[in-house]
Amino acid sequence: ALARWRSEGVVKELNGHKIFVHASGPESDDGVLIIHGYPGSSWDWQGVVEHIGDKARVVVSDMRGFGLSVKPLDGTYQSTYTLQLQADIYEAVARDAGLSSVLLVAHDMGQSVGLELMARQEEGRLPFRIRHAILTDGSTLVDMIQLAEMQKKLLAQPDVAATEDLDFNDFMEGLRPTFGTAFSASGDLDETLVAMAHQVFYDHGSRVQAQILRYLKERKEMFSRWSRTFFTFRSAPLTLLWGVEDPVAVIAMADRVKTERPYTDLYKLQGVAHWPSIEVPEYFADAVIARLDSV
């Protein structure tokens, strides 16, 4: 499945960065733009994309430093991996795909990138239109975050690329607790963890994981802007799909958004933890399909 996903996409030069882009479905200037999370990649969404099929144009790419996109080893976080830079690249992805309006889907770290794009729309400076936003399991409300042990270890490291790769098995096992009970019991978890780790370790990507994780510090710096957008976004409908068992982006975060913005649609996913697109891809895809006609 991983090899097929890679073969279906293409690495493009966007804003001067080599970015892996997977596009599917009928050609259209209206489509679904998906932003993945940390430490995932576009591959996390292959089940969702497959289930949507020919019902919509779907574009999902690997962020800089992730998956098959470029993973510079010679920069700092500020010069190479900021969420603002990632948002700029997603503008370029949409432009290159010919998208003028999108149903935006964003997860985890990508949730903050999505909120930056949403903030730009509210300010009238986004070059395409978000007509519906679906946000899922992410700790943009960083004052409520529950860091995983792997995250704590990586954050303690300096802002330079490591000289050696991380231990593959240790990294893989660090992801295991972030999956919910239903998926863990399905028999698919081990294969999924291997595929996810391969995406991280491709082209020495594990060496920049500690640098990229500094996005948590950027979230603190941008807390006012992105939380305000979360709570007051007016220019399109907002839907939250959230795993009840998420140990990092806890369900209380979704409850808080619902309290602050009561007209938000919130769907709590029982038995699901941090990776809804992997754990319940058909459910997630159906939620996207149901919102394709949003004005």
Tell what function each PLM region has.
Residues 21-23:
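Conserved hydrophobic "DFG−1" position in protein kinase catalytic cores
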Residues 1-8, 17-19, 39, 45, ...:
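Flexible "cap/lid" subdomain of the alpha/beta-hydrolase fold that forms the substrate-access gate
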